[in-house]
Design a protein with these regions (language model features):
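Nucleotide/phosphate-binding loop and acidic/charged catalytic motifs
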Residues: 149
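Alpha-helical DNA-contacting segments of helix-turn-helix folds
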Residues: 114, 153-177, 197-201, 205-216
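Hydrophobic residues on short alpha-helical segments
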Residues: 123-127, 171-174
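Alpha-helical bundle regulatory/interaction domains
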Residues: 1-120, 127-130, 134-136, 142-146, ...
Length: 226
């Protein structure tokens, strides 16, 4: 949930490997539902004053088994959904706990199809390893050819498996960077490789992300302190 009661706020969204379902309303914009695809580069946005946003973040398998659609055309893009998508309306933004209850029930209702075991294992390995397994290793563990996996990824998500694993490694570094650990803790070959990959996906150096001036990196701002 994000509630911006004051003036317009500029923020930067960083790639995190998730698909986001956004319900929002502001003083100038009516209630709307938007589906955000995978991001591969930072995006600067302005959150208008008096804006309330409720967001639901999904892992990739949800696109096929809960949202029932390909998001390949939504790479670095968004789709405006019908305003009554999943039977939500502006009144649902008044109570976050009730919103969470309602969305949880809806997700369970949409999950009607048995999940392919190979896909389930593939994503379990990807997320548990935080993107640190190679495409070859994943292919061998799942017993699914690299070519078929990449075809599935490109058709369903608009991105290769290798590129997506890079985003997962990047996302896994958020907490370390926020804590001031500006050195590689994921599967980066060395410090220069770490800095290069972080800058490629964020547009900034690790130390700039750590400083997070004016809370502009919204995902860093909501990370818990340790």
């Amino acid at each position: 949930m994000l509630d911006n009661p004051s003036e317009n706020k500029e923020v930067i969204l960083l790639p995190d490997g998730r698909i986001d379902l956004i319900y929002s309303q502001s003083a100038k914009e009516p209630f709307q539902a938007v589906l955000l695809g995978i991001g591969t580069h930072p995006e600067q946005i302005v959150i208008a004053e008096k804006t309330k946003i409720f967001a639901v973040s999904f892992n990739l398998l949800a696109t096929e088994y809960i949202l029932h659609q390909s998001v390949s055309k939504l790479l670095n893009s968004a789709q405006v959904l019908p305003t009554d998508f999943w039977d939500f309306n502006v009144d649902d933004l008044n109570d976050f706990e009730k919103f969470c209850e309602k969305i949880s029930i809806k997700i369970q209702q949409e999950l009607t199809q048995k999940i392919d075991e190979r896909k389930l294992k593939l994503f379990d390995l990807m997320y548990s390893s935080k993107g640190n397994l190679t495409v070859k290793e994943l292919s061998e563990k799942v017993v699914w050819s690299e070519r078929q996996i990449n075809r599935y990824f490109n058709q369903q998500f608009g991105i290769s498996l290798k590129s997506y694993c890079g985003i997962l490694r990047f996302r896994a570094s958020f907490q370390h960077i926020k804590e001031g650990k500006l050195f590689p803790e994921q599967n980066f070959t060395d410090q220069s490789h770490f800095i290069k990959e972080i800058k490629k996906l964020s547009g900034f150096l690790p130390k700039e992300l750590n400083q997070n001036k004016n809370d502009r990196f919204i995902q860093f701002s909501v990370l818990p302190e340790k």
